[in-house]
Amino acid sequence: MKEELLKRFTKYVKVDTQSNEESKACPTTPGQMELANILVTELKEIGMQEVTVDEFGYVMATLPSNTTKEVPVIGFLAHLDTATDLTGKNVQPQVHENYDGKDIVLNKDLNVVLSPKQFPELADYNGKTLITTDGTTLLGADDKAGITEIMVAMNHLINHPEIKHGKIRVAFTPDEEIGRGPERFDVEAFGAKYAYTMDGGPLGELEYESFNAAGAKITFNGNSVHPGTAKNKMVNAVKMAMEFNAHIPKDEAPEYTEGYEGFYHLISLNGDVEQAKAYYIIRDFDHLKFVERKTHIASIAKELEEKYGEGSVELKLNDQYYNMREKIEPVKEIVDIVSAAMRNLDIEPKISPIRGGTDGAQLSYKGLPTPNIFGGGENFHGKFEYVALESMVKATEVIIEVARLFEEKE
């Protein structure tokens, strides 16, 4: 299993599937369709049935039931795209066997070092096989570890018919990182009663609560005048953006929050005297606080527009997804069965809220309750991203055990 996981994973991460928020297409980048087509071929090769990919890059496939019992159809999902935070082009995965607990030099020329001083959780991986970046890209374990684990689990079940299971559906979706994954996902065609995303982090993570999420695009329109004659005429759009940000509570940012605490996050700010654009994301687990945060953003925009004149501040505020807890708690047994599967494999479940989002958050609101299971990765979205091969083995085993337990309990 280890060898197959390593071979597939290192192949998948070399396909550049970074999504693009500026694109209106689906998928937003051609690399996602490239990977989708690779997976379609491989799904057919291992013996999966009803293998399809649509024009939008959604891959679906079926592993038929091998039991006479009436077992609910379950699904496993992972996303094709990688994050926009750092390039996913020319990913060169590095394999470090029997990690010794010391610094790992990712890139000597650029002095990029993965160090337990900065990332103390590395101590948990002594003796493990770590797959890292070369220090110039992200790795793409989010979520190609999940894709790999689903592929290997299905292959294992096909080759081990003694493991009884109901009908299993798998899906690989585009553009999750920019919040569009479920937009064109056909829940009815997928045909599962329950599903799981393999999109979590370290070993044991199990999540069924997510943020309520919104995005705020703000355009500041200034007035550029020659600096020598600018008095009482110039309006500096960049300074307007700075003034806007000064109204955001400094301690309510990602770098100062954890657990159930929400935040405002300035993703990007660019511009000049004439015009500047800022993009914020707004996150909170509590719906009332979420609404309050959006109201605060809108009130700052209104205040500045009143100060600088009509049209000086343009705000586009949109909801992205909601906390899926509301949709999963009525069917909490689908979380309990994963906890049982983990314990059967000597994994202690770590149930915590997702400080982020998964396709499952939106799918749960489309009628498909979808908790999130660990994929094994650490430090997602950056050059220090890595995954332990042993964690990927465990995630694969969890998929297999969940399928077995669903059949056993009927």
From Swiss-Prot:
The keyword Lipoprotein does not apply. Its EC number is 3.4.11.4. Keywords: Aminopeptidase, Cytoplasm, Hydrolase, Metal-binding, Metalloprotease, Protease, Zinc. The active site is at D81, E176. Zn(2+) 1 binds at H79, D142, D199. It catalyses: Release of the N-terminal residue from a tripeptide. NCBIfam families: peptidase-T, PRK05469.1, PRK13381.1. This is Peptidase T. It comes from Listeria monocytogenes serotype 4b (strain CLIP80459). The lineage of its organism: Bacteria, Bacillati, Bacillota, Bacilli, Bacillales. The gene is pepT.
